[in-house]
Structure formats: C-alpha cells, structure tokens
Amino acid sequence: MGRGGRRNPGRPRRGSLAFSPRKRASRPVPRIRSWPDEERVRVQGFAGYKAGMTHAIMIDDWPNSPTEGEEISVPVTILDAPPMYVAAIRAYAPTPDGYRCVTEAWAEIPEELEMDRVFTVPKDGEAGDLDKIEELVDEGIVEEIRVIVATQPKKAGVPKKKPDVMEYRIGGKDVRERFEYAVEILSEEIRAKDVFDEGEIVDVSAITKGKGFQGVVKRWGVTIQDRKTQRKQKGRHIGSIGPITPSRVRWTVPMAGQVGYHQRTEHNKRILKIGEDGEEVTPRGGFVNYGVVRGDYIMIHGTVPGPKKRLIRVRPAVRPPKNAPEGAPEILYISRTSQQGVRPKASEDEIVEQLGGPASA
C-alpha cells in the first residue's frame, strides 16, 4: 500500500519534507551560501527593502515568445535600494573543511552609519590590515576575497536606524584583481547601478512573511475529515500519527507548528530597471504600508518573498536560462496610480493632454 489513506492509497504524502525543519529563521537577513563563477570583477550582490508592487507595460523581448515584439503588461516589484557602505575586507583560505577566514581589514566607520547598534566595530589593527592580506594573496594562501557591507536604512523608507550588515563575494578569476578592487571600494558607498545592469537575470533571497503557529491543515495541507470521521466534532487533524509498533512517532508525521518566516530563494528573476529617482515608480500617495521611495530603486519582474519593509538580497543568477534576452528591456509605462483607493483630481494640463491638445507651457 502507498503512502495515501484508505480511500486513495497511491497518492503522494501531504506536504513536502524538503524544507524541514520548518522553524523560524534565526535573523531577518538571509544567508547566501553559493556564488556564481564569473570573470567580471564586481561585488556579487546588492540589498534593498521591499516597497511594494505595481505593473508596467514593456516590449516583450524574450526569444521565441508568443508575444515577442509586442506590448505586454507585467507585474513588477520595487526595491528601495539606497547606497551600501563597504565596511571591511575579508580574506579566505581553503581548508579540508571549506573556506575559512584568515584575516580581515576594517575601514573607519562613520558615526552616522550607527553600526555600533549591531556589534562592537573593531578598532584599527585589531582584526588585521590590508598589508597582511596583500602578503597572503602574493603567497597564494588566500583564494577568496569578500567584503562586509552595511545598508543605510535612514536613506530608505523603512522606520529603522539599525543597519543590516552582510557579506558579499567579489567576483572575478584573478585573486589579485579582486583584492585590488576591494581596496578601491573600501570605505566607499556602492550603488545598485555599480553592481547590476538593466535586463540582468538575478536570484532574490528573503525571509518570508511570518504566519505564526498553525495547524496541520494550513501547515501541511492534509485533508479535513468529513463529518462521520471526525472525533468530537473536530476534523482539522490527521487521522493517525502512526502504528503501535514501532512505539515512536516519526519525524515525517504532519504536526502543528511554525508557518512562515523561513528563508527562501527565488531563481532567475529579471531586473527591468535601475533608477535614481524613486518618484518615477512611487504611486500617488506612496506605497501602502511603506511610503515613498526617495532615492535609488531596483524594479524586478514578478514577485519576491517577504512582506513590505523586509530586506531583500539580490545576487547574479547561479543558473541563468540560456535563452535569456540581453540588454535592457524597452519599458513604455510604469503605473503610478494611487493604491490608497482614492483617485486624484487630474490637472488641467493632464486633461488637455488626454484630449489630444497641446499642453500649456
């Protein structure tokens, strides 16, 4: 007999065990454990805060698409992506257990960044210096160069002062070139346009929206028992947690518990636009539950995990599609209609323009 019940013994089990254990993420900043191999020397990723969604009209440029060359309406997600501050360089050496950090060099952290809210920032000389890293690079001991960066939420629309600190790999083939680039951007701000190109395929990682403690029906998708099968008029539970022998409950049995607030990565999203003026994409009245995008932004085709104001990490795709279009797409229109449920009164110039007449000077 299969894994199913008495009525349908051959059906697959309810829910997936691939994401076990389904527990809360340890912190709101997702971890990136793999990086793409590429020749371009750059910081392999950026981070922004999810502002909301809207829609855009663009020319479909995917090869062999049924609507290739035609206008299509697509959903887009707006990430509020203020510049990030490069705070430190880390050098990694290979060991039998993987890469291990051998030393790091910190820049002078500006007080307005308020990184002391996160941890005690190392003083000069406490955690190594650039000369030591350079020696290890010349000796061939160091094979991996990464940078520690911090977001600047004060420049975004999120109500927080504490920066989010994370680590990004420096891409490239030659370790010396990667180290020199890291030294060049140390103690400097990097922007989204310095990392990504419009039209690039990327992966996005985030912590999903938390749902709290939920039962087995919502958590695992088990069937609600019918009226005659229920015990004590309660049908939102599993019929059996296992046989008498073995006298233990297996870990695969659906149980109630945490739903949401898990780290998830969605692959092969496309960056449609990178801009410097958030007014270009902010709806009238601002994004609901977020506000106004004031500066740099990233517009991604489709959805990304997490609620509004959640940190979203973006990196170059590790397995990009082979037929992906190259270059920036042609965007004809970005919807800025109010999401507040209130339609603003059109100005005289807008009315004249809609009627086809010349606008006033």
Swiss-Prot record:
Top-level taxon in the UniProt lineage: Archaea
InterPro entries given in the database record: L3_arc_euk, Ribosomal_L3_dom_3_arc_sf, Ribosomal_uL3, Ribosomal_uL3_arc, Ribosomal_uL3_CS, Transl_B-barrel_sf
Comp. bias intervals (Basic residues): 1-14
An MF annotation (GO) of this entry: structural constituent of ribosome
Coiled-coil annotated residue ranges, if any: none
Keywords: Ribonucleoprotein, Ribosomal protein, RNA-binding, rRNA-binding
Entry keyword annotation includes Ribonucleoprotein: yes
One Gene Ontology term, aspect cellular component: cytosolic large ribosomal subunit
Gene3D superfamilies with a match to the protein in the record: 3.30.1430.10, Ribosomal protein L3, domain 3, Translation factors
BP-aspect Gene Ontology terms: translation
Pfam families: Ribosomal_L3
Subunit structure: Part of the 50S ribosomal subunit. Forms a cluster with proteins L14 and L24e.
Chain's role: One of the primary rRNA binding proteins, it binds directly near the 3'-end of the 23S rRNA, where it nucleates assembly of the 50S subunit.
Homology family: Belongs to the universal ribosomal protein uL3 family.
Listed name of the protein: Large ribosomal subunit protein uL3
